[in-house]
Amino acid sequence: MISEYLFPKRGNFLRKNSTNKLLISINDNELNNIYLINGTSFITKNIRAKDLIIEPHNYYMIINNGKKKIKINYNHDISIHDIIYNPYKYEYSKKSDFDPETFKKLYNIPEGFIDVLSKWYSIKFTYPDYNLIYIKPEMGISIQVHYFRSEIWEILGGKPIVINGNKVFYFVENGTYFENPINTYHSVINPNIDPGNFVLIREKWEGKFDEKDIERVYNPNKYY
């Protein structure tokens, strides 16, 4: 039996299971305080013991959404599993927001944008009727919900991992669309290692556009 502790509002790595079935056990009293990725499912409530069985070659991740640390037990060594996404790889690194002018020149950003939101892990160029969002390799945006607007995403590059409602989509091809209705979970992870291989999304929205309508239910980048 292998164990680890997960502190409040922290997640472990998104991993890919090996050839054996992985059995995860968590105290029953804590199951209501976790979010779980198991293969193509993103489970946020009514988690049961059977949901913690990870089939061979499936992806998995646990997020502690509670207020106390939890103990996670595994029936075999997970250190041999491939790490697809480490949310905290740059936690203690010096962080600088992208410079919009430099980024524009490097990545041939189309003219006509009316606003820019630059962070250290992503940059968004706002046009009159859509946004272009670039996400840094090995990074993801927070798992979030909106209360006053819905969004439509079109994947334009980078083959991201996308959380859309209670489903997870892996290495998504260009031209794929996702609808994110009001009050539904959504997120994007860039699994690429090449520092120039950004994920690119074209985002459109309906409703009231206001960054303050976001609830970030899992926010490893600590951006508010």
Model-predicted segments: where are they?
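Conserved hydrophobic/aromatic beta-strand scaffold that supports enzyme active sites
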Residues: 51, 130-134, 152, 177-179
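A short, N-terminal "cap"/entry segment at the start of jelly-roll beta-barrel domains
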Residues: 1-19, 55-129, 142, 216-224
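Tight coil/turn sites that cap or link beta-strands
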Residues: 7-11, 57, 136-140, 148, ...
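Anionic, Ser/Thr-rich low-complexity intrinsically disordered regions
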Residues: 82, 195, 200, 207-224
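Short histidine-centered beta-strand/loop micro-motifs
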Residues: 13-17, 123-124, 133, 141-147, ...
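Short acidic-glycine-tyrosine-enriched beta hairpin
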Residues: 33-60, 125, 164-187
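Glycine- and acidic-residue-biased ligand/ion/polar-headgroup-sensing regions
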Residues: 10-45, 49, 137, 147-166
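Surface loops and adjacent helix of pleckstrin homology
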Residues: 65, 75, 146, 165-167, ...
